[in-house]
């Protein structure tokens, strides 16, 4: 409703700002893109606390990775504090961002004077403190609480000789949950995927799922993480249950229970899509084959929800017999 009202009013861009929940950021971005596609730019800024996390626990890199993977045009931070306290968050965001970084601080810290809230940073100091943020690489700059037209005017004057650089493309491969990210380095250590959350051959788990219980799922998740799993595969495929219902339940419960990214594993396209929709981070899809039906639906879903995926060199022609055939099918 908000998106349609703003489109009718003739907006030039959407600024989703002062966000504390990454999942709410995702919801806003999906609402915009499902209403008007990519026709209107989207800027998303979150607010961070002193521990450099949002109120819901998201760190700066995770916010950037998820928002960029979903196709927003710029990402950053606003409100929170004054520009002098934003340096480390900005540096951490810039390390992983390939899109413009937005910075809109408050005019310092609030204080109460004669029953009115004022801010302790005047326009001159605000402009001075914005300079190092621009020099670091922030390219869209403004102000939030306590800033006035004078603050913005002084900032512009102080930055007139600073050239805005187009961010360089970062080669960051990463999965996330709502709070943290897992960088996957092709030259680094293996990231272990725990695959025990699968009812095939596990009668106890099958029975629990038929009773719509998640106790054993949580136990399996915690045990695998304790033994070194960096990613958890989630498969709910068994007879006698509503697989989609149980997949969504498992995703919600595991998101709260463990601090690792999830890998969505189902033979059904609609179940994968629904799980990606509610997952509050950047998930992994296990897997996408080269069969036309899978390519047709799952590649767009991966793009829409920002997911990574495992690509199987398997097509309607059958299993490739050697490396050359695998390369041929993939390319």
Where are these regions (language model features)?
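Domain-level signal for soluble alpha/beta catalytic cores
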Residues: 1-331
């Amino acid at each position: 409703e908000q998106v349609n009202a703003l489109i009718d009013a003739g907006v030039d861009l959407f600024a989703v700002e002062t966000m504390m929940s990454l999942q709410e950021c995702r919801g806003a971005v999906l609402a915009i893109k499902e209403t008007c596609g990519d026709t209107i730019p989207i800027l998303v800024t979150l607010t961070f606390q002193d521990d450099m996390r949002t109120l819901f626990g998201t760190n700066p890199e995770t916010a950037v990775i998820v928002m960029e993977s979903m196709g927003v045009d710029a990402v950053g931070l606003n409100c929170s504090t004054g520009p002098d306290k934003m340096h480390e968050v900005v540096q951490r965001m810039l390390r992983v961002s390939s899109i413009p970084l937005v910075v809109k601080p408050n005019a310092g810290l609030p204080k109460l004077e004669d029953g009115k809230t004022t801010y302790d940073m005047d326009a001159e100091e605000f402009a001075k403190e914005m300079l190092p943020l621009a020099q670091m690489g922030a390219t869209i700059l403004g102000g939030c609480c306590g800033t006035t037209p004078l603050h913005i005017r002084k900032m512009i004057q102080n930055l007139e000789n600073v050239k805005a650089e187009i961010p360089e493309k970062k080669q960051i491969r990463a999965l996330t949950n709502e709070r943290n990210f897992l960088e996957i380095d092709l030259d680094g250590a293996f990231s272990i995927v725990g695959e025990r959350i699968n009812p095939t051959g596990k009668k106890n788990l099958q029975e629990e799922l038929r009773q719509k219980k998640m106790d054993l799922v949580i136990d399996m998740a915690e045990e695998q993480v304790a033994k070194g799993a960096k990613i958890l595969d989630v498969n709910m495929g068994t007879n006698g249950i509503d697989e989609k219902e149980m997949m969504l339940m498992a995703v919600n419960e595991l998101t709260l229970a463990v601090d690792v990214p999830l890998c969505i594993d189902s033979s059904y396209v609609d179940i994968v899509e629904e799980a990606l929709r509610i997952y509050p981070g950047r998930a992994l899809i296990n897997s996408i084959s080269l069969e036309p039906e899978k390519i047709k639906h799952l590649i767009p879903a991966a793009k829409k929800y920002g997911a990574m995926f495992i690509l199987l060199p398997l097509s309607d022609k059958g299993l490739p017999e050697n490396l050359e055939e695998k390369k041929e099918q993939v390319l």
